[in-house]
């Protein structure tokens, strides 16, 4: 059976994925599947830098505004829904463009990760529960941070069930020291991985500027509205960068200025971790946006690369 080409456009936060993804989709007759763990949530628009309807320019997007902020969305569920949408898009004879920077979401499509198998791994779960009883939640949360810092940052340490579940996913059928070791490529798809990057200082400037724009556009008001709607601060969705810092400002833990600076700092650190993650994709083609006169020049070069890559 012919593999479905899976065009994956990724890169660190604020690099410029959204604009380019729309241009690529329009030129390649593609529909877009979002691989962003924050844009999945309704009502969380400003802090997630969610693509707007106007920005979409009529290009169909999937896995945006998919669930309410109190829904415990998992990597396993992302994989199930994304696979369903991939087949729907393919049936329409359109290209599939996956765009976003959540590494675990991308891995769940690139590699043959069987979450049903991890669901059945009772022995591992019992061992983790035993460690939890002996060493406590702080130890377990720190262990998760070593394996998957992004999930650890989003899962509150008091949510023991989610911490254990995330550790199960990380530890199922692989070596602990490298998430993608021992994983085989998904045989259904031909992943064509494109990683966007920029000069580090320029990227950090863009991150700082984006945070300033989020604040100006009403991030504080967005968080207040979420609280007024009954969404709690210990929810997974509320642990996202931008949201957790504003919550601490509203609780009086940070000043307004401190909250903004910490969002910028944490976003820069996140970008650095993302770049490290993407370097594991040995077949990926990297493009430095700062080396191009304009976005159309870059878009045309990427389209040529994609056409040459499709088997």
Curated annotation (Swiss-Prot):
What biological-process terms (Gene Ontology) are attached?
tRNA modification
Which terms in the Gene Ontology molecular function aspect does this entry carry? Answer: ATP binding; tRNA dimethylallyltransferase activity
Q: Which reaction does it catalyse?
A: adenosine(37) in tRNA + dimethylallyl diphosphate = N(6)-dimethylallyladenosine(37) in tRNA + diphosphate
Indicate yes or no for the key word Cell membrane: no
Cofactor needs = Mg(2+)
UniProt binding sites for substrate = 13-18
* Chain positions recorded as ATP binding sites: 11-18
Task: Write down the InterPro entries for this protein, in alphabetical order.
Answer: Dimethylallyltransferase, IPT, P-loop_NTPase
Q: Where is this site: Interaction with substrate tRNA?
A: 102, 125
Query: Where would you find the membrane-spanning parts of this chain?
Result: none
Give the EC number(s) under which this enzyme is classified. Answer: 2.5.1.75
Q: Per UniProt, which keywords does this protein have?
A: ATP-binding, Magnesium, Nucleotide-binding, Transferase, tRNA processing
User: What is the protein's known function?
Assistant: Catalyzes the transfer of a dimethylallyl group onto the adenine at position 37 in tRNAs that read codons beginning with uridine, leading to the formation of N6-(dimethylallyl)adenosine (i(6)A).
Supply the NCBIfam families for this chain. Answer: miaA
Give the record's subunit note.
Monomer.
User: Which family does the record assign?
Assistant: Belongs to the IPP transferase family.
Which HAMAP family does UniProt cross-reference here?
IPP_trans (MF_00185)
- What name does UniProt use for this protein? tRNA dimethylallyltransferase
Look up and give the organism this protein is from. Answer: Clostridioides difficile (strain 630) (Peptoclostridium difficile)
State the organism's lineage: Bacteria, Bacillati, Bacillota, Clostridia, Peptostreptococcales
Encoding gene (name)? miaA
């Amino acid at each position: 059976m012919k593999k479905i080409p899976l065009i994956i456009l990724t890169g660190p936060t604020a690099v410029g994925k959204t604009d380019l993804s729309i241009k690529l989709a329009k030129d390649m007759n593609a529909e877009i599947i979002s691989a962003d763990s924050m844009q999945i949530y309704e009502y969380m628009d400003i802090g997630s830098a969610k693509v707007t309807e106007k920005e979409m320019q009529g290009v169909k997007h999937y896995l945006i505004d998919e669930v309410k902020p109190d829904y415990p969305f998992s990597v396993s569920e992302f994989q199930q829904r994304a696979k369903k949408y991939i087949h729907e898009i393919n049936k329409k004879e359109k290209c599939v463009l996956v765009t976003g920077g959540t590494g675990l979401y991308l891995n769940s499509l690139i590699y043959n990760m069987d979450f049903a198998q991890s669901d059945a791994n009772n022995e591992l779960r019992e061992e983790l529960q035993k460690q939890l009883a002996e060493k406590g939640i702080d130890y377990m949360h720190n262990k998760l941070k070593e394996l998957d810092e992004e999930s650890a940052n989003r899962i509150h340490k008091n949510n023991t069930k989610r911490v254990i579940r995330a550790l199960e996913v990380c530890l199922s059928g692989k070596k602990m020291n490298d998430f993608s070791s021992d994983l085989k490529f998904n045989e259904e798809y031909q992943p064509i991985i494109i990683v966007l990057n920029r000069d580090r200082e320029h990227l950090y400037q863009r991150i700082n500027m984006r945070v300033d724009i989020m604040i100006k556009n009403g991030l504080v008001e967005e968080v207040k509205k979420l609280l007024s709607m009954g969404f709690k601060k210990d929810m997974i969705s509320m642990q996202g960068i931008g949201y957790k810092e504003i919550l601490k400002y509203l609780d009086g833990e940070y000043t307004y200025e401190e909250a903004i600076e910490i969002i910028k700092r944490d976003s820069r650190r996140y970008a650095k971790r993302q770049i490290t993650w993407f370097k594991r994709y040995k077949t990926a083609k990297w493009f430095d946006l700062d080396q191009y006169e304009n976005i159309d020049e870059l878009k045309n070069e990427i389209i040529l690369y994609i056409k040459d890559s499709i088997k």
